[in-house]
Amino acid sequence: MSENLHPRADELDDLTAREFVGLMHAEDGAAVRAIAPLLDDVARAVEEIAERLRAGGQLHYFGAGTSGLVARLDAAECPATFGVDPEVVQAHAVEEPAQEDDRELGVEFARRAQLAQHDVAVGISASGRTAFVLGALAEATSSRALRVAITCHPGSALGRAADIAIEVETGPEVIAGSTRLKAGTVQKLVLNMLSTAVFTRLAHTHRGRMVGVVAGNDKLRARAILVVAGLSGSSREESMRALEAAGGNPKIAIVILRLGVVAEEAGGLLERSGGDLKAVLAAGRAHPA
């Protein structure tokens, strides 16, 4: 569908700049709204992915071209945002045009990923027929990994190959075939939902804060201080001291301040809870020292 001509294609060259960007804005809005009928499918994928990651699985994205770049973008942000190891969310992408047509290359990439039954393979393709991605999902079938498809073509081959199909009908692009536009935007929005909701359900956030943030620069260190102060009710100075004692780990710092324990005990409580800050704080309130 993204290859079809836009209804206003013949007049695009004659539009003013304001008319052109207004048209694109309207098209983007329509594409975003097209996700709404599929939210049940997105939510189902979130629940299934969270269940597998809770069991020690990994989340693998497979895409080519724009879809691959979108996959890489989402995967790259997960460690810093949620504090997960880079291996937990991995993007397997190709960029050369000829590679998109290579089904066996997709199979090879999936084999290298060593997919297992607790893992998740997410195939991303605007057309839903990219050979590289189809090959990857075919290999995922033999490993019993969960297969999720994100496409912009309802009834696609990729959707049929998946356990859960999220097929958002975005319609023709303003420039026919330019899937970096609406299709790429929608793919990123769906991946935003999947990764953010999954890691929130896995307790890598708390009350809308990045309690897993890895403070690798000044901006993130400042954010970590705000997170600790906001969730502990402590001053900036107290939060900084707790973070230092916690080795920069916001969750440990929050437990130190909220429960009045030392860093080693705070870390142990979190480890025994599987990193669930909410559970640790609730247990601390129920059983005060």
What kind of feature is each model-predicted range?
Residues 37-54:
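A short, well-structured juxtamembrane/interface segment
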Residues 23-31, 88-95, 206, 233, ...:
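Gly-rich Lys/Arg/Thr-decorated short loops/hinges at beta-loop-alpha junctions or inter-strand turns
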Residues 198-289:
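Short, amphipathic alpha-helical interaction segments embedded in low-complexity terminal/linker regions
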Residues 40, 44, 131, 185, ...:
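Charged, alpha-helix-enriched surfaces in structured cytosolic catalytic cores
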Residues 1-38:
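Cofactor-/ligand-binding subdomain signature composed of acidic, glycine-rich
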Residues 59-190, 196-204:
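Glycine-rich phosphate-binding loops that contact phosphosugars or nucleotide phosphates
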